[in-house]
Amino acid sequence: MKISNICFSYQPPGESHQEVMERFIRLGVASEELNFDGFYTLEHHFTEFGITGNLYIACANILGRTKRIQVGTMGIVLPTEHPARHVESLLVLDQLSKGRFNYGTVRGLYHKDFRVFGTSQEDSRKTAENFYSMILDASKTGVLHTDGEVVEFPDVNVYPEAYSKKQPTCMTAESSETITYLAERGLPMVLSWIIPVSEKVSQMELYNEVAAEHGHDINNIEHILTFICSVNEDGEKADSVCRNFLENWYDSYKNATNIFNDSNQTRGYDYLKAQWREWVMKGLADPRRRLDYSNELNPVGTPERCIEIIQSNIDATGIKHITVGFEANGSEQEIRESMELFMEKVAPHLKDPQ
């Protein structure tokens, strides 16, 4: 089992940007001190939902302050930057960290990102997949080559050469299209923390079927499960503090994108739009019901309940790497205490899939 920490870098009401960034650094360092296997962060722009806009710089900081843990992105928004810039940043971090950087990617969701950076949101899937393949190929061959579908330029050598023989990487996958793209290439996917186990199982079944058809060893692909976690010996306190955080956090998430508006006609996000409609039909548009749903799915409560939730996900999906976010625990001291309790009373009891 691998257990990593994930930091969203959300700016709660009343906190300054400086406080959020200083906490981000301390949580990264604490992750190594507490024997987590990794520390991951997310890219967002123009919203308090997450204020680490440049993950290459953010990860470089944490890599420079640690010696052992893997530091990764979950993920880099691929369509908003040129693939040559992406691959150079990836290779520099791979060399400087001696292979401790995990290159996690996403296609992007937030309309402001695409508008400001000057790229098409409706073409984001095609662009992300095209760039991702180019970048990973270049990290292996040392040559950045384009097929001309999205961008076109002569082949160029990229520097420095990769440190890692096989680049640690992953991509967040929710729709069948993304899952199929990754499975065809045998690339790892990240599963969402806001869907039930049954849906995660369906995603894994689709992935494994397609990957096997394309000759990949499905037992040798390191997928990642994600969770929001609040662990406390007092289960009611864990539930309450998590709700206080998530109530504002969910509102910030919904307000940062217009994808969920009924009037939005952006193509290419059918899965997320359908998911939101299903939530509305279940009453989950109501903040209280949404928090009930979230806390039921995630390790929120006593150590025993956290073990039960996570282990059931591990056994159902066969995934051996989990990332756990602790920012929903209140103050920085409370976040640290929850991390400590997790590593003391939850992590030792998590087993490989049965």
Swiss-Prot record:
GO terms for cellular component: cytosol. Keywords: Flavoprotein, FMN, Luminescence, Monooxygenase, Oxidoreductase, Photoprotein. It holds the Pfam family Bac_luciferase. One of its GO terms (biological process) is bioluminescence. SUPFAM superfamilies: Bacterial luciferase-like (SSF51679). Its EC number is 1.14.14.3. GO terms for molecular function: alkanal monooxygenase (FMN-linked) activity. InterPro entries: Alkanal_monooxygenase, Bact_Lucif_Oxidored, Bacterial_luciferase_CS, Luciferase-like_dom, Luciferase-like_sf, Luciferase_bac/NFP. CDD domains: Alkanal_monooxygenase. It catalyses: a long-chain fatty aldehyde + FMNH2 + O2 = a long-chain fatty acid + hnu + FMN + H2O + 2 H(+). It is an enzyme of class 1 (oxidoreductase). PROSITE patterns: BACTERIAL_LUCIFERASE. Light-emitting reaction in luminous bacteria. Heterodimer of an alpha and a beta chain. Belongs to the bacterial luciferase oxidoreductase family. This is Alkanal monooxygenase alpha chain. It comes from Photobacterium leiognathi. The gene is luxA.
